[in-house]
Every structure is written in C-alpha cells, then in structure tokens.
Amino acid sequence: MLFDLFKALVLGIVEGVTEFLPVSSTGHILLAERIFDLDQDNFWKTFAVLIQLGAILAILAIYFQRLWRVATHMFTDPAARRFVIGVLVAFLPAVILGLIFGTFIKEVLFNPWVVCFSLIAGGAVLLWVDQQDVNPRHHDAMAFPLPMYLGIGIAQCAAMVPGVSRSGASIVAAMLFGADKRAAAEFSFFLAIPTMLGAFVYDVYKSRGDMTMDHAFIIIVGFVVSFITAIVVVKTFLDFVTKNGFTFFAWWRVIVGTLGLIALALGA
C-alpha cells in the first residue's frame, strides 16, 4: 500500500509538472510507468488518465475569471463568441483523427522507443522555432484569427504520437503563425481544456471495468498532487517563457529522450 501511494505521488507530480509544458506529459508518464514496471498494468494506465482531470481543473482555477466572462458573454460579445468558435475549430481536428486512428495509435505507437525519438525530434523543432528572429503580431490568446485557430488545431494532431507533446505542437504552431511566446503558451492551456476533457471522458468510459473503490484513496492522492503541482507549474511557466523562451524545455526533451534511448539500448 505504501509503495502504491509513493507511485501515485510520483505519477501525480509527473503529470502536474509536464502536462502544460512542451515536453510531453504522455511521454514522461509512459517512461515513469516503465521505470516502476507498470506499463502492462491496466489499473495504472487508467490511473494516468484519471489524474489528468486534476491538471485540467488547475487551468480552470487559474483562468476562472477570464473563462467565466467568455462563458457569460459569448452570446452578446462578438470577441467572446469568436474565441469560443476558435477553440472549437482548433479542437475538431483532434476529435476527428482521434476517433479514426485512436486505437491504432495506442496499440502501435505507445512504446518507449517512439516516445524517446519523439522527444528528441520535438526538442529540435522547438529549439529551432524558439531561435527564429520574428516580430510577433498576435499578443492575445483570445483574439487570434479563425484560420490561425484551425492551423494550431491541425498541428496539435501531431501530439497523438506519444512524446510529441500536445502543448508543444500547439505552441510551435502558434509562434509560427505570429503569436508571442506568452500568448502561444496561454492558448495551449485553453485548447487543453476541451482536448483533455474529451480524451478523459473517452478513456474513462473505455477503462471503466478497471476501476474499483479499493483504489479510491490512491486515485485521490494522484489527483490532488496533479492539481496542486499543475497550478504552481503553470504560473511559473508563463513568467519563465516570457523572459527566457523555450530553449530550456527543448534541451530537456533532447536530454530525456537521449537518456531514455540509452537505457532502452542497455535493456532497461
């Protein structure tokens, strides 16, 4: 029991730290499960899905006032309505491709080798984009043009490959379309809400047979840890990238991916 609580604590921290950073939470969770030898355990796979809700609620808590204003004014305020439409437009590509290829991706691509190669490749792309000398044109994540929302949504589909990073793909796309670094990061948070909620509901429905009340306390621990960690990380992350960009996270990806490949090659 104590070791299970320790695993729940570690996985909750990993989820909360990595979910909204451009480093791939799925990739890090898969590697953590490999370290604890949990990658074939159905309960822990379900646990990894459930604790995502803690991270989602962290975003809702941080941006509650802005999101509440959008929700209460979307029928009277054109700007609020355009933002809601933009998020839905960005969300749809992942829904369509997820329904078509979701099972194939989980059965074929969810393995540590793919994760490690994706971490390295994504790190190289993030490093390249971060070092481009561009003059950003868009500074408000709630006021991007509709075609830009669609482009970000299409780019986010790359994150169906574990290790790519949902937030990383959307941040890279937003910056290439002319968003400043803070706005790119913030929109990745907003887009995460429907994307992660949709994936959460779908995965919970499919995994409902693997959950029992015997696991309730372990799940609560992971959920709370994920929520608290995500709040701290998101608030710190925005200030950090505004001042320093994404180079640190690009090298984080490359180093973790490289160490993972070495460990796998040695039979870990």
Swiss-Prot record:
Transmembrane segment boundaries: 43-63, 85-105, 108-128, 141-161, 184-204, 217-237, 246-266
Locations listed in the record: Cell inner membrane
Major subcellular site: membrane
An annotated Gene Ontology molecular function: undecaprenyl-diphosphatase activity
This protein's UniProt keywords: Antibiotic resistance, Cell inner membrane, Cell membrane, Cell shape, Cell wall biogenesis/degradation, Hydrolase, Membrane, Peptidoglycan synthesis, Transmembrane, Transmembrane helix
InterPro entries noted in UniProt: UppP
Keyword ATP-binding: no
A Pfam family the protein falls into: BacA
Any one of the GO CC terms: plasma membrane
Signal peptide (residue range): none
UniProt keyword Ligase, yes or no: no
Top EC class for this record: hydrolase
EC number from the UniProt entry: 3.6.1.27
Reactions catalysed according to its record: di-trans,octa-cis-undecaprenyl diphosphate + H2O = di-trans,octa-cis-undecaprenyl phosphate + phosphate + H(+)
Membrane topology: Multi-pass membrane protein
GO BP terms in the entry: cell wall organization; peptidoglycan biosynthetic process; regulation of cell shape; response to antibiotic
Known function: Catalyzes the dephosphorylation of undecaprenyl diphosphate (UPP). Confers resistance to bacitracin.
Similarity comment: Belongs to the UppP family.
Note: Bacitracin is thought to be involved in the inhibition of peptidoglycan synthesis by sequestering undecaprenyl diphosphate, thereby reducing the pool of lipid carrier available.
Name of this protein: Undecaprenyl-diphosphatase
Gene that encodes the chain: uppP
